Structures are given as C-alpha cells and as structure tokens.
Amino acid sequence: MTAVFVLHSADGTTDPSAFRKQAFGECDPFARHREIAWEGPDAMAAGRIRFVGEFDVARYPHIETLIVVEGELTLEAAGAAPLVLGPGEGAVIGVGTALRVAAESRVLVMFCAAACTKPTKRGLFALRADADFKPSASLPAEVLLGAAPQCRSDNVFIDDGAGYCAGAWDSTPYHRIVRPHRVNEFMLLLAGSVRFAAPDGSVLSLGAGDALFVPRGAPIGWESSERVAKFYVVQNVTVSTERE
C-alpha cells in the first residue's frame, strides 16, 4: 500500500529506508536530528526525530506536533512549568514560541510540522491520552458500510493561518469505503487497531503505538472492530501555507 506512510511500528519493524535526513526550513532547530518520510507541496512534513541534548529557541520557526515513542523529552515554554513527555505523550508548538528543549538520553519522537507565515496561535500545548473528549461529528451515511460510529474529539490546537488542527480523537467501531482522503493527516494510534484498505484490495493493519501519515487525495478505507483512539494532526490544504 503506497497511500499510507508508516512512520513508526510499535513492534520495531519500521523501515529505515522510508526516511531521509533533512531539515524542515532554513531555521529548523532539529535540523541535524530530523528524518522526513513525507513532505508535500503545502509546506507540511511528517517523520521522526532522534535527539539527545538541549537547546533554546527564541522564536520557534514553524508549527510542530511532537509525540514521544521512546525515551523522555522535556519542553519548557518561557514563563511556564516544564512539560515532561514520556512514551505516548505529546505536545504542539505554535510559531513564535520561546522554548527550551532537553533530553538527557536519546529520545525517539514522531513529528508533523507545517510552515505558517501568518500564525494565529502561539504557545506550548500538551496532548494527553486521557483527553477532554467531547462528542464530534460522525461520518456521512454514503461512505459507511454499516452503522454510524459515535465519535469524540479534543481539539487542543488550531492555527487558522496554516489550516492546522491537532488533538485527540476516539470512535466506536466502523467500516468506511475506500475514498480519497480529504485532508493531510498524521495519526498515532493510542488504543485499538485499524485495517486501512487500498483500491487494489491490499490492507495495512496497524494498532496501538503505530504512527502513520495519509496525504490529501490518497485513496484509503477504514475498518475497526473495537474502540480506536488516536492523536491526530489534520491540515486543510485549501489554506495557503507557502513559506516566505
């Protein structure tokens, strides 16, 4: 299946050839540590970061969601208490945020970043598996193969300047047809498992601890038989996000 980019497999089978070492923009604070699996025309990228050490950033240059899968990462925004992230925890950093980043030993982090020349939100925002879930819209009947699911979400961060939204989401089981994905979407599964189907009939099965990226327009289906929870980032690419 080529529609989905697997960024991390909890069972340790992640393909290292799927990544290339590359900075995200000219002022990337993780330039020496970043490995990109997907970068699109809408100034968004997804992949992983392997990091140990510390640094300070006076003004974070882009929007970035970071989710730890191995080790411990400390993020400290100016004037705020340190945010210590372990496996299965994450945070979103807004453009312009003054930040200290530290890891005493090597940490493996999934990322989804987006450039934004006209940001609307600054700061550091925690992502938690025990999110403040609220009922959210279900799927239209015409794309479902069975009963409509009950969905909940907690939108932790929204920046209208990049069409970027990050948070947590969960749902009861459902089965959806293969259709073009309507947004760029990063996911890290927190609970449950999903069978992602391609038009050729192939299926990719992913579960808790796995991370993936689905580009806008990629044809993909969804089938789950249990509650699924995930951290997510979505980008509405109708918003212009070109770098200056």
Feature map (PLM): residue ranges:
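Conserved hydrophobic/aromatic beta-strand scaffold that supports enzyme active sites
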Residues: 46-48, 65, 90-92, 166-168, ...
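Short, conserved beta-strand element in jelly-roll/cupin
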Residues: 60-75, 180-196
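Ordered, small/hydrophobic-rich secondary-structure cores
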Residues: 1-91
